[in-house]
Amino acid sequence: MAKIIFIEHNGTRHEVEAKPGLTVMEAARDNGVPGIDADCGGACACSTCHAYVDPAWVDKLPKALPTETDMIDFAYEPNPATSRLTCQIKVTSLLDGLVVHLPEKQI
């Protein structure tokens, strides 16, 4: 299991245990973390699972594929340096302690 820390826009923290093989989006959804809408269910066809990866973790994640970066353009206030779609980040033991910040809203 990997601990993933979600920080809402208002500062509320949610620490969840995520099973390797799931996505960060699935971990949020399965644990009732607010702010991850995931309207497309993880198909990389919307931007409602958008989050900002903590800067300390950006280089520890696999690079986003072009399909993800294209979809991030539709997210609320994307940040080219830290924005990711959580449906595209697979949980592994190497992500234990991952911190993601949630945007004010999803669009």
UniProtKB/Swiss-Prot annotation:
Keyword annotations from UniProtKB, A to Z: 2Fe-2S, Electron transport, Iron, Iron-sulfur, Metal-binding, Transport
2Fe-2S ferredoxin-type domain segment(s): 2-106
One annotated GO molecular function: 2 iron, 2 sulfur cluster binding
Signal peptide region: none
S-S bonds: none
Effect of disrupting the coding gene: Disruption of this gene is lethal.
Binding positions for [2Fe-2S] cluster per the UniProt entry: 40, 46, 49, 87
Membership in a protein family: Belongs to the adrenodoxin/putidaredoxin family.
Function of the molecule: Ferredoxins are small electron carrier proteins that participate in various redox reactions. FdVI is an essential protein required for growth of R.capsulatus. May be involved in Fe-S cluster assembly.
Protein's UniProt name: Ferredoxin-6
UniProt organism field: Rhodobacter capsulatus (Rhodopseudomonas capsulata)
Top-level taxonomy: Bacteria, Pseudomonadati, Pseudomonadota, Alphaproteobacteria, Rhodobacterales
